[in-house]
């Protein structure tokens, strides 16, 4: 009974192993959703395969740095996770090129977090000059939800954050998840439906 209790069924047609959700998903391990990193060296080494090399406790019980290495692609990805006194999770990522050749980075997520499959809608904020923070509500489905800023700075039309709500959530009650990217440049956030029925949420810069 252990496989039924501890594992998840493999949906057809898919790889014959269960690729678990991670904080830094990548193509090299068989993850076919949005990845945490898009980078290459002259068109090669684009499918990174990270493995944990060290865990550094910054504050035991509250903050740590997870160091992930790919010796073939010659890169190190360090993920900083911190839970503050209000139970807000802070995520930061740092990418280091450990090779001799130039590495072209097209996208790096500050973090990847799971969302429950019953998540119903995403509430984001749009606008224009003197009319910022206008509420935009979109239903979540099996389509990819994406919001992107290409202006190279903070914009009036694309706030780097959103709120994901479960059914029945209002401004005063219910279950919601909020996230904000602390970056005043080009940025992107995506919410993607996964094959197991859950969602993943990414925010980062490009």
Language-model features: locations:
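Polysaccharide-binding surfaces and accessory modules of carbohydrate-active proteins
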Residues: 1-206
């Amino acid at each position: 009974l252990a496989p039924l209790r501890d594992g998840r069924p493999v949906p057809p047609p898919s790889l014959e192993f269960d690729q678990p959700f991670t904080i830094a998903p990548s193509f090299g391990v068989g993850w076919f959703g949005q990845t945490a990193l898009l980078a290459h060296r002259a068109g090669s080494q684009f499918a990174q395969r990270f493995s944990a090399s060290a865990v550094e406790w910054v504050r035991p019980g509250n903050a740590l740095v997870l160091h992930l290495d790919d010796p073939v692609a010659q890169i190190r990805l360090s993920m900083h996770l911190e839970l503050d006194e209000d139970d807000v999770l802070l995520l930061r990522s740092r990418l280091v090129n450990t090779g001799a050749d130039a590495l072209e980075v097209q996208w790096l997520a500050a973090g990847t977090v799971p969302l429950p499959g019953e998540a119903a809608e995403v509430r984001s904020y749009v606008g224009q000059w003197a009319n910022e923070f206008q509420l935009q509500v979109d239903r979540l489905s099996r389509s990819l939800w994406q919001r992107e800023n290409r202006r190279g700075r903070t914009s009036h039309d694309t706030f780097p954050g959103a709120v994901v709500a479960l059914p029945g959530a209002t401004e005063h009650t219910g279950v919601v998840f909020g996230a904000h990217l602390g970056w005043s440049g080009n940025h992107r956030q995506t919410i993607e439906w996964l094959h197991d029925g859950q969602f993943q949420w990414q925010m980062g810069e490009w």
